[in-house]
């Protein structure tokens, strides 16, 4: 870190830059918790020191070819290349790290010992270990994916509006359910209402399905783990065989639900990465993350901020929360398996969300016609117990609900 600081100071003196001076750091004990929703700065011209090291802790293998870890690894390496960093020599990885406090701490210690300047931990269960490490290693930057903890100096969190992308994927599933004449849609999820992350994703997908096919029922089978390839396949098969589901979606790490869907002759919507290659006869589209959008911003801030303690101030917030408008989430290219009208509807709704005129969890629902056009209708947002979450015409629930306290399924969703 000392070498990095010296080099950065020299560069800034020569170029008369003052990147970290753009934002005043919060006073001790204070923190800016308002999420940054746009790119902090899209100018990637930044000195890339040869001794700058990026550390990453992955829950699955760095060699995965699809799914959650694959998407993060691709995002990190893409961002590094965009910034002039060399992943072959400047990326340090500890992979296949379970959500176990001691194992995560060991991975962090390894990366710090190898000289990492910034460490990304991509799994929710790493949260407490990263919080402790940020205090133990104040000269290192810690950035936690999908979490909510942070400090005012060297520790932030990042996530995004995945529910927006899932709504779009739900549109594809809804059109396909109508085409095949099957109102039963299945969903293999890591967890259900225990976590707002999974609940909001399931609800967003379901609302997209129901906007196209109001007679649909979405059956959810939960794994109790973020990754479990055996049961990811088994539960998809159960949803097909027991509940008669004709489309299978997922919130889990591998492509196994899509492969199971193909083997059973039905269709599916993946997650994290385009899974068409894994299940070319079944896959419709996937809700995906463009993780490089965030990783580029964070790495750039880490190289510009001079001291790790200035990182959060340089980022402008201790939390990053991007969506369709920032290009942080999206859907993968639609496959030839999609039904007529799907592309038109997804493009129209995507433009509506990006415009800021409408969002998913509001008291205004969309009714999507066969030609892909939509009508906006004031309607109560109701959970599957009949409770009104948002009254007809009301604004979207707050971000804090979507990321923290959404512990219900919307009407139309059933636990399998």
Which residues does each PLM region occupy?
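Positively charged n-region of N-terminal signal peptides that target proteins for export
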Residues: 1-9
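A residue-level marker of the well-folded mature domains of exported/periplasmic proteins
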Residues: 22, 28-416
């Amino acid at each position: 870190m000392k070498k990095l600081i010296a080099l950065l100071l020299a560069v800034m003196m020569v170029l008369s830059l003052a990147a970290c001076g753009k934002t005043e750091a919060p006073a001790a004990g204070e923190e800016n918790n308002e999420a940054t929703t746009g790119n902090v700065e899209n100018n990637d011209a930044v000195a890339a020191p040869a001794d700058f090291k990026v550390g990453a802790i992955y829950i699955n293998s760095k060699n995965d070819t699809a799914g959650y870890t694959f998407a993060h690894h691709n995002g990190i390496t893409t961002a590094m290349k965009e910034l002039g960093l060399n992943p072959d020599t400047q990326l340090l990885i500890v992979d296949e790290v379970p959500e176990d406090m001691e194992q995560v701490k060991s991975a962090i210690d390894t990366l710090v010992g190898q000289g990492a300047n910034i460490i990304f931990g991509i799994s929710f269960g790493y949260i407490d270990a990263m919080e402790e490490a940020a205090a133990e290693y104040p000269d290192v930057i810690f950035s936690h994916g999908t979490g909510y903890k942070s400090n005012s100096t060297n520790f932030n969190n990042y996530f995004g509006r995945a529910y927006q992308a899932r709504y779009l994927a739900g549109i594809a599933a809804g059109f396909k359910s109508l085409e095949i004449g099957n109102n039963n849609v299945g969903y293999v999820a890591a967890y259900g209402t225990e976590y707002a992350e999974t609940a909001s994703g399931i609800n967003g997908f379901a609302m997209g399905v129901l906007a196209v096919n109001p007679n649909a029922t979405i059956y959810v089978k939960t794994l109790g783990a973020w990754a479990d390839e055996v049961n990811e396949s088994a539960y998809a098969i159960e949803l097909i065989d027991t509940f008669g589901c004709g489309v299978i979606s997922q919130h889990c790490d591998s492509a196994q639900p899509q492969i199971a869907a193909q083997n059973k002759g039905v269709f599916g919507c993946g997650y994290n990465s385009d899974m068409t290659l894994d299940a070319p006869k079944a896959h419709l589209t996937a809700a995906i993350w463009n993780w490089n959008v965030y990783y580029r911003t964070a790495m750039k801030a880490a190289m510009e901020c001079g001291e790790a303690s200035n990182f959060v101030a340089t980022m402008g917030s201790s939390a990053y929360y991007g969506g369709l408008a920032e290009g942080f989430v999206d859907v993968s290219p639609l496959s030839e398996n999609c039904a007529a009208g799907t592309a038109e509807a997804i493009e129209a709704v995507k433009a509506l969300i990006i415009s800021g005129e409408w969002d998913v969890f509001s008291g205004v629902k969309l009714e999507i016609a066969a030609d892909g056009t939509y009508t906006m209708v004031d309607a109560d947002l109701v959970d599957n117990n009949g409770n009104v979450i948002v009254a007809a015409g009301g604004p979207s629930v707050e971000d804090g609900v979507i990321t923290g306290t959404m512990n219900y399924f919307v009407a139309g969703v059933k636990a399998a």
